[in-house]
Amino acid sequence: MRVKELHPLCCITLESPHGINSQSPEEPVTTALTRSRSLPAKSLTGGSESETVAGILYKWTNFGKGWRSRWFLLRNGILSYSKIRRPENLNLLSPDDDVRLIGDISGERLSRMDSCSGRRKQQKTVGIVHLKVSSFRESKSDDRKFYIFTATKTLHLRTDSITDRAAWLQALASTKCIFPLRSLNGDFSFIPPKDLSISTERLKKRLHEEGMNENLVKECEQIMLSEFSEMHGQVKLLHEERTNLLDALRQLEAANLEVGASGKHEFSSLGRGKYSECSTTASSDGKQEFEDVSEEDEPSFHDTKEFFNEPNIGSESNLAISGHTDIKRRTKLPDPAEKEKGVSLWSMIKDNVGKDLTRVCLPVYFNEPISSLQKCFEDLEYSYLLDRAYEHGKSGNGLLRALNVAAFAVSGYASTEGRHCKPFNPLLGETYEADFPEKGIRFFSEKVSHHPTVIACHCEGKGWKFWGDTNLRSKFWGRSIQVEPVGVLTLEFDDGEVFQWSKVTSTIYNIILGKLYCDHHGVMQIRGNRQYSCTLKFKEQSILERNPHQVNGFVEDVAGQKAATIFGKWDDSLYYVAGDGINKSKVSDPASNASLLWKRTKPPPNVTRYNLTSFAITLNELTPGLQEILPPTDSRLRPDQRHLENGEYEKANLEKQRLERRQRMSRQLQESGWRPRWFERQGESDTFKYTGGYWEARGHRNWDDCPDIFGEFTEELADAA
């Protein structure tokens, strides 16, 4: 029997050979649609979603409490977990639930909540994971561990046996398989146009009564059928949009519940948001867990949808050294204690005519309140580019990894724009550390040689390590100074891919007369040990240059074929296009087919004459509790630099003169066989590499072998060296 419903406008009857959604002939259409929305999930998924899985898993909490057992329940695409308050009872939802238990759980321990009376109180859920927007993988180093990655946290889980882990992974995979089918089915279905017919008998009868001929009636019928078909297509598109919006709403609601259960959202978009460190003693069921996952083999993900800016999954020592929670970085330098007096370069040159230039001490007026060691760390301001590169490589996209590495190599020059003061020259043996958990990195540098001046650094991030040393060779050309960095920077990812490059030449113009400015020029070769390498050309600025600071280059594969073209400005942004097709119009209009790789952050609102970036302002800050655990060689403890930052210029000049006299005596230490404390020279090469042990010594506050380099220099100190 056919179902007929009168169209309210045109007297059109909808006909379907099987009815709409297979409802009975007597049911109206509206009733059938309402019933289809309430169909059980198993009717859409073949019963896969109706299965509930439960069991006990061990969840990593923190280094104080370690692994703790939790009761996990997988139901309808949601994985929830709760603390086991009473070991003798593990609550299930209701007596009607068909629950598959994983693991060795005795029946006496299980209890079910009476859905009618609610006499037994259900355990409180402390965490929720929506599997549709999550991914998971097994551990390569432990056959009982696996990980679940979400936008807000990473769960580190462990089972009692290999069999139990396989069962949980199979259950998670089966649950994820239902989502594509579910999103296509939606809440109710439309009848395909080919199965839908329209009865126009009443319309034709009415037109004949009006005296219209047969040809005109057929033409009206065709117009009506065409309009109805178009309307049906539009309604179908609206239905699909509605379904997608409902799916997105479900995901947002689940994520909101997850954040509410965890107590605080600890995920920052693009690495720039607020971040809360995990305490080493507090419970971590509602906080971000950390563990060394990167040390394992190349992971095989069950879901490739991941987020670039996961909180750092560093080594165990990375968490152990983080003794502060909710570190709030400063946004401006301290207000100066006294008014600064300008210094005439001409008068300074006149006063020092005929003197030994090696003994001439420049006033602190020409310095900025950071050291060259801290300046090295400033190059890692945009370290999120390396996090992206790590994620791209992990997902198999080597080209995007190489592009982000190139963007990182360029981004380090952005902070030099408008910076006219020189950083403090470190003393021999001076060090600097930077533990920035909100960026997922920790950095360490040391001055390893005084003649020539060599600075070595080492940085650890999420899935990558960065190290290098640099020696500056300078040439004076009368009106300008040319600085050529000598040294190789190395970036190594946990999967073994390595990139190496050297910095380009920098020139400071108009040091005597005119407006002082800095420019970078030359060719940078970024060499990779696998599929891709990169060549970047920093264009030298000319007098009539209308578009200065340009950078152009390309990424090529091992066969020499250009895979992507890069262009932009080292002080603003960098773009890329696939292949070798680029022209000048794209350079002037980045909004064309190019994709943005990196963009410089906006300068701080409180600009001083130093023109420090927001990131550089934080480098010399002594956050609460930090001074007590720093070694006596750290740059933050250097007195002349601290006085300059506080605006105590007279004290800064006196301390600078004292320390530079001590610095000249440091050559005796180097000539007597002095060696760096934390770095060593690699073989016969001139490169230095981090030997390790600094962060461990920091954890124990063991600085017995670190000299007081900012104190008075004595002959006994030289003899002891």
UniProtKB/Swiss-Prot annotation:
CDD domains per the UniProt record, alphabetical: PH_ORP_plant (cd13294)
Tissue specificity comment: Expressed in roots, leaves, stems and flowers.
Entry coiled-coil feature ranges: 640-669
Residue ranges with Basic and acidic residues bias: 299-308, 325-335
Annotated region described as Disordered, given as residue ranges: 20-47, 274-335
Domain of life: Eukaryota
Name of one Pfam family that matches: Oxysterol_BP
Gene Ontology BP, a term: lipid transport
Residue span, PH domain: 50-177
InterPro entries to which the protein is assigned, alphabetical: OSBP_sf, Oxysterol-bd, PH-like_dom_sf, PH_domain
Function of the molecule: May be involved in the transport of sterols.
Family in the record: Belongs to the OSBP family.
The name this protein goes by in its record: Oxysterol-binding protein-related protein 2A
Organism of origin: Arabidopsis thaliana
